[in-house]
């Protein structure tokens, strides 16, 4: 039976093991994308961006092909721990009320809603990033992010166990160490979304949208002087966006119109309440302030790692420059911009600050955003506006939705 290839649907992304049809010596043969990549060389596939060339938050963006492929390999999952072992089932990309196998999710409160974050390859120098995504780049690196990160901010159950679930309010008024301890109650491979994840998600956003103003591109997030009311709105308002990015309208009598946001499946990365990001710590040595980037599933104020100098003071001014460099460090280095220039987000720092939080609360308004960062506070501080995001540092067994529900 003949097949008309021109009548078949087109696709906008491929995995490395998937194949093209080609003609070799008059015969039809298959060639995998991975092998084609090796034949053609890296540069034809990997987009390159350069930041901070002007105050305009928009910058030249090559084809988002690699970013699209990486996003398609992400996606929402329901995860469940059974007898100490983690299992995960893919959610339908466009509707998280269903599993990918078509089974309707029975009860989201039985699971952790997580987003798969595959290893992400890149090569960077100074202010220029070459994005490999799923594909290694010769001489490049991998962002040190956990491969599974909560779609929602952490909430607690009655036993003070951390979860990533919709339809509940996020937990606050905990130290970073307390959030970590609550996550570990799920299992030793659970922890918090870290600084490596922050660097990855900012890079992916950059190569996907070509505009550093996340509030303008995606949405404002919650913004109100009634920030406690914003904080306490139950999570899951963006569930209709599935694996995607964008905003939805939320309205109540106290807050009026608000626009919770979702980026690559992650809800409210900015504008609801701050999120701790372990994996980086700060200290003073004389008059110089340093950042130390440390590895692993841990929360520490003493861990060793690579270090670089950082600003010792900032009071919420808008970021103009970040560390970037070979590790594409997302930590700010200078301020002086505005809410529509450079990174468009605010930065706070002090000589006594020891830990990082990101995103911003509803009260911070236009200073919130994906790039917003605060290194002002001590390691043991907790406040009603501080939250965290769950992460899983292991490898769950992938099952179907119906199989997960039966466990």
Q: Which role does the model predict for each range below?
A:
Residues 199, 220, 225-235, 244, ...:
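C-terminal, surface-exposed recognition/capping segments
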């Amino acid at each position: 039976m003949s097949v008309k290839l021109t009548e078949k649907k087109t696709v906008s992304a491929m995995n490395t093991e998937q194949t093209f049809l080609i003609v070799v010596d008059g015969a039809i043969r298959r060639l995998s994308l991975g092998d084609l990549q090796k034949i053609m060389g890296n540069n034809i596939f990997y987009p390159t961006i350069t930041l901070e060339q002007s105050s305009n938050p928009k910058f030249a963006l090559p084809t988002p092909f690699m970013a699209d492929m990486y996003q398609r390999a992400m996606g929402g999952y329901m995860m469940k721990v059974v007898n100490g072992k983690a299992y995960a089932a893919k959610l339908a990309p466009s509707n998280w009320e269903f599993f990918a196998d078509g089974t309707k999710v029975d009860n989201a409160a039985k699971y952790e809603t997580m987003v798969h974050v595959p290893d992400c390859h890149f090569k960077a120098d100074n202010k220029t990033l070459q994005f490999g995504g799923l594909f290694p780049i010769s001489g490049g690196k991998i962002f040190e992010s956990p491969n599974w990160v909560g779609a929602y901010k952490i909430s607690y159950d009655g036993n003070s166990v951390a979860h990533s679930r919709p339809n509940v309010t996020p937990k606050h008024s905990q130290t970073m160490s307390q959030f970590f301890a609550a996550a570990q109650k799920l299992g030793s491979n659970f922890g918090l979304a870290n600084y490596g994840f922050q660097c990855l998600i900012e890079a992916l956003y950059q190569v996907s949208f070509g505009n550093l103003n996340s509030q303008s591109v995606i949405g404002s997030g919650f913004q109100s002087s009634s920030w406690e009311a914003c904080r306490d709105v139950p999570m899951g308002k963006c569930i209709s966006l599935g694996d995607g990015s964008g905003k939805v309208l939320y309205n109540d009598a106290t807050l009026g119109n608000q626009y919770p946001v979702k980026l690559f499946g992650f809800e409210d990365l900015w504008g609801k309440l701050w999120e701790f990001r372990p994996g980086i710590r700060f200290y003073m040595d004389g008059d110089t302030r340093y950042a130390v980037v440390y590895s692993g599933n841990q929360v520490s104020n003493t861990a060793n790692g690579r270090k670089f100098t950082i600003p010792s003071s900032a009071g919420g001014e808008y970021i103009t420059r970040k560390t970037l460099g070979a590790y594409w460090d997302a930590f700010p280095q200078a301020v002086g911009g505005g809410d529509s220039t450079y990174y468009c987000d605010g930065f706070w720092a002090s000589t006594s600050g020891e830990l990082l939080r990101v995103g911003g609360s509803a009260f911070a308004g236009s200073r919130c955003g994906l790039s917003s960062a605060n290194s002002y506070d001590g390691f043991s501080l907790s406040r009603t506006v501080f939250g965290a995001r769950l992460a899983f540092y292991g490898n769950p067994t992938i099952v179907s939705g119906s199989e997960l529900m039966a466990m």
